[in-house]
Design a protein with these regions (language model features):
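Conserved N-terminal alpha-helix of the aminotransferase class I/II PLP-enzyme fold
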Residues: 64-97
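A glycine-/small-polar-enriched, mobile loop at the entrance of the PLP active site in fold-type I
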Residues: 37-40, 55-73
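PLP-dependent class I/II
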Residues: 2-4, 8, 12-14, 19, ...
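Generic structural signal for well-ordered alpha-helical scaffold segments
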Residues: 24, 78, 82, 108-109
Length: 397
């Protein structure tokens, strides 16, 4: 009997996409579901960016694009990195990919050999360990729990590094927790990493502009770290362009050349019209980015306030992104008489079926005591969702 490859069978399906799909199916049945499982802004792409895309269509940007991306877009990314982050790159040190997800995977596949270890602080984005496994590497999970604001310490990093370590994947601001590493915390991690120049850092900075505690700081900005860091970023979150599928990597030229070789064999260049839209995003008026950030911060404050009023939840204070990651383990072992809650996946499914609110269990993110709620939705939806959750949890004994 024909079977899927062992490589594919090693991969787990995306829990976030699975919950979003389940939510969509219930909505199609006429059920009023509030979807707080999705990881994308609810805003529309700014008009000036859409106009640039329309102009690109009229100017017949409809052919294959260069594998690493149009030079003008890469120049815009280089300028962004210099002006916003104080980092000097050339266009040969930048590659554009089909969304941030492909870019992260490109970097992993370009550097990780079978048997190599990749350090991943938990909680983590669901796809990181799966990408490492796809490359034949071994994910080394470092638990950074609620009590340490979900951030790995320098001591934990030092203890996790072995002779097999190839990479650290670091996401700040974080999906799923919203935690942001401070400049001082990144400096401490950098001091450890500089003692191990063979270990690369894949810095996922896709939520860079959704930051509530000040200007973003990249670990690549730490003295002596730039050649050890590959930055992954893109337009999806900051510019509400998730469906345009444009991300980028910036790093040492030899690594970017490797990613170019890889990308050339399995996706080639990204959508030409999307690239022109992304170029506009980086070069035109940036006021919409700040307007969306302010709205997310207001929603953050609202959901934290309301969630703290729900008995049994221990609520974190996100410093960035648009996720809340509360502890829900006080409900484990409880039941509504029909269904028992044994773990965070059960907890999230109970909320979907009983409260009609879609969330994601923390098991998928490497922290079984918590669950993730996205507040990339309206204030009204946040208020109604927490009300439903509170009522549903009140039925558990």
């Amino acid at each position: 009997m024909a079977q899927l490859s062992d490589r594919l069978n090693r991969l787990a399906p995306s829990a976030t996409l699975a919950m979003s799909q389940k939510s969509s199916e219930m909505k199609a049945q006429g059920i009023d579901v509030i979807n707080m499982s999705v990881g994308e802004p609810d805003f529309n792409t700014p008009d000036n960016i859409k106009q640039a895309a329309k102009k690109a269509i009229d100017e017949n940007y409809s052919r294959y694009s260069p594998v690493p991306g149009y030079p003008d877009l890469r120049k815009a990314i280089v300028a962004k990195l210099k002006n916003e982050n104080g980092l000097e790159y050339t266009i040969n040190e930048v590659i554009v990919g089909t969304g941030g997800k492909q870019c992260v995977c490109n970097a992993v596949l370009a550097l990780v050999n079978p048997g190599d270890e990749v350090i991943i602080p938990a909680p983590y984005w669901v796809s990181y360990p799966q990408m490492v496994k796809l490359a034949g590497g071994t994910p080394v999970i470092v638990n950074a729990g609620f009590d340490q604001d979900f951030k790995m310490t320098a001591e934990q990093l030092e203890n996790a590094i072995t002779e097999k370590t190839k990479m650290l994947i670091l996401c700040s601001p974080s999906n799923p927790t919203g935690s942001v590493y401070s400049k001082e915390e990144l400096a401490a991690l950098a001091e450890v990493l500089k003692k191990h120049p063979e270990v690369f850092v894949l810095a996922d900075e896709i939520y860079e502009h959704i930051n509530y505690i000040g200007k973003h700081h990249s670990i690549a900005q730490e003295p002596g770290m730039k050649e050890q860091v590959i930055i992954a970023n893109g337009v999806s979150k900051a510019y509400a362009m998730t469906g345009w599928r444009i991300g980028f990597l910036a790093g040492p030229e030899w690594i970017i050349k490797g990613c170019n070789k890889l990308q050339g064999q399995y996706t080639s260049g990204t959508c030409s019209v999307s690239q022109k839209a992304a170029e506009a995003a980086y070069t035109l008026d940036q006021s919409a980015v700040e307007e969306m950030r302010v709205a997310f911060e207001r929603r953050r404050n609202l959901i934290v306030k309301l969630a703290k009023e729900v008995p049994g939840l221990e609520v974190n204070m996100p410093q960035g992104a648009f996720y809340l990651f509360p502890k829900c383990n006080s409900y484990f072992g409880k039941s509504n008489g029909e269904k028992a809650i044994n773990n965070s996946t059960d907890f999230a499914m109970y909320l979907l079926e009983e409260a009609h609110v879609a969330t994601v269990g923390g098991d998928a993110f490497g922290d079984p005591d918590c669950f993730r709620m996205s507040y990339a939705t309206s204030d009204e939806n946040i208020v109604e969702a927490i009300k439903r959750i509170k009522e549903a949890l009140g039925k558990l004994k």
